[in-house]
Regions:
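Secondary-structure junction/capping motif
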Residues: 2-3, 16, 243
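Bacterial N-terminal signal peptides
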Residues: 8-17
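Domain-scale selection of a single, long terminal region
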Residues: 16-20, 24
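Exposed acidic/polar residues on beta-strands and adjacent loops within beta-sheet cores, strongest
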Residues: 23-243
Length: 243
């Protein structure tokens, strides 16, 4: 084999390798941004689980990835790491009956907005993942974030018990799950709980269930378990087992 052939082979391999690295770098460049706030009509009739009595306007923002609208969101975003953040999704739901006839020029009459799950958004990969928070209830749970911890009042699957819950993103089970009170889905205060309050040192969370005294719990801090993947494969959605 001539030296020229060997040199050509190495040059080809170097070119292919460089091209692959360049392609990978280009593929991972994403621009993730939240748009400006806008107000949309909102009501308890359209979102019976989450809307407060008398609430008629919802402030929303678009989530853009590379200039493309991916989701609508509501409320404040929380930075979990320097590349990932969480924000609550809002869903635009078709409220038209099969018998309803479209009204020319009216694009909004048969659509309603509903508060949805929390999303984990990765600024590097541009990927958004719905978080599966244990015992999370869209109408009851007001989430208070600290680091990668979510604290909120949760409702058990039987809908008979109200729990104090602290969940860690990507954790396999709740960091805290303590019963606060019995829960009556047909007759309960609105809101059921105010947003919990965090304290850093010592790490402590205080819950505020309606109609009773506040309850505090000390939390033993641990290391983050969130894996921010940079590969091309879809990540397994962060999941937490329920009781």
């Amino acid at each position: 084999v001539s030296k020229t052939a060997v040199f050509s082979a190495f040059a080809l391999l170097a070119t292919l390798s460089s091209g692959s690295l360049t392609h990978a770098a280009e593929r991972k460049k994403h621009i993730v941004a939240l748009g400006a706030l806008k107000s949309v009509p909102y009501s308890k009739a359209g979102d019976p689980a989450s809307a407060a009595t008398g609430e008629d306007v919802l402030k929303i923002r678009a989530l853009f990835v590379d200039g493309v609208l991916k989701e609508w969101t509501t409320g404040d975003a929380h930075d979990v790491t320097d590349r990932s953040f969480v924000v609550r999704r809002v869903i635009r739901l078709n409220d038209a009956l099969p018998s309803d006839k479209p009204i020319p020029g009216d694009k909004a009459s048969h659509w309603v907005w509903q508060r949805g799950p929390w999303l984990l958004v990765d600024r590097v990969s541009g990927r958004e993942t719905a978080l599966r928070l244990p015992d999370y209830d869209t109408g009851v749970s007001q989430v208070s974030w600290f680091r990668d911890y979510a604290a909120y009042c949760g409702v058990t699957p039987s809908r008979k018990s109200l729990y104090a819950v602290v969940a860690q993103i990507a954790g396999r089970k709740p960091v805290l799950a303590k019963k606060l009170a019995a829960f009556d889905p047909e007759n309960h205060p609105d809101p059921v709980c105010a947003a919990p309050d965090w304290q850093r040192e010592p790490l402590r969370i205080t819950f505020h269930p309606a109609g009773t005294d506040a309850v505090s719990y000390d939390i033993v801090p641990g290391s983050a378990v969130l894996v921010e993947d940079t590969g091309d494969e879809d990540e397994t959605p962060p999941a937490t087992s329920t009781k």
